[in-house]
């Protein structure tokens, strides 16, 4: 088995999908998890205005609405959370995402004060925090807020990790990589776009340039620039196609570098890192 084949196997990627079937599978998955855990009544998800949170949010709202209709339990709720650092440059896109999702509840928690307070505390301890590290602090603060909301609402936190993000390790460890349930796991970037098209999302939600937008000194830095490889190349790789040797090497290098992110904290019994 080649490394490419092994990665495809581990990430459960299918070369060809039926978007309607994938939507149904994710919705049923989200419903089943709450039904299996009757002490949970809500799903919580941060909404950025990008493709991934728009899709995960819509699937969550659909699941919650079906649960309410099927059980008669009005406690089932989906809580969408805006988590800007100060003023978000593409706030209009986030509002489009909320209009598409139509969440039961929408909260806004501005993380700027918390992040800046953490930076001041670290600097007082004699540490100079890089802009890149600050970006990771932002991502982790967003998860702190989401888990606080989930803790107060008997909730579980949804993550937006998908195959194209997973293979490159393009997420913050214990930041956006920290969640309870991943309804997009197995999907490539283009497959997620196909689901949004079926769900009749505004094209701007899946046609915009993907960006984590975490670094102050590199605002709106495109994912593809940061990764050095395009999503088309990543998706082609994950769907079993042949791509350039350079792109393949880049993807596989990211895969190896990100292995630690795909594991729980390392114990003496783990050997993947050796």
Curated annotation (Swiss-Prot):
Transmembrane segments: none annotated. Pathway: Cofactor biosynthesis; NAD(+) biosynthesis; NAD(+) from deamido-NAD(+) (ammonia route): step 1/1. It catalyses: deamido-NAD(+) + NH4(+) + ATP = AMP + diphosphate + NAD(+) + H(+). Mg(2+) binds at residues 52, 165. ATP binds at residues 46-53, 160, 189, 211. Its EC number is 6.3.1.5. Deamido-NAD(+) binds at residues 140, 173, 180, 260-261. SUPFAM superfamilies: Adenine nucleotide alpha hydrolases-like (SSF52402). It is an enzyme of class 6 (ligase). One of its GO terms (biological process) is NAD biosynthetic process. InterPro entries: NAD/GMP_synthase (IPR022310), NAD_synthase (IPR003694), NH(3)-dep_NAD(+)_synth (IPR022926), Rossmann-like_a/b/a_fold (IPR014729). Keywords: ATP-binding, Ligase, Magnesium, Metal-binding, NAD, Nucleotide-binding. One of its GO terms (molecular function) is NAD+ synthase (glutamine-hydrolyzing) activity. NCBIfam families: nadE, PRK00768.1. Homodimer. Belongs to the NAD synthetase family. HAMAP family: NadE_ammonia_dep. Catalyzes the ATP-dependent amidation of deamido-NAD to form NAD. Uses ammonia as a nitrogen source. This is NH(3)-dependent NAD(+) synthetase. It comes from Streptococcus equi subsp. equi (strain 4047).
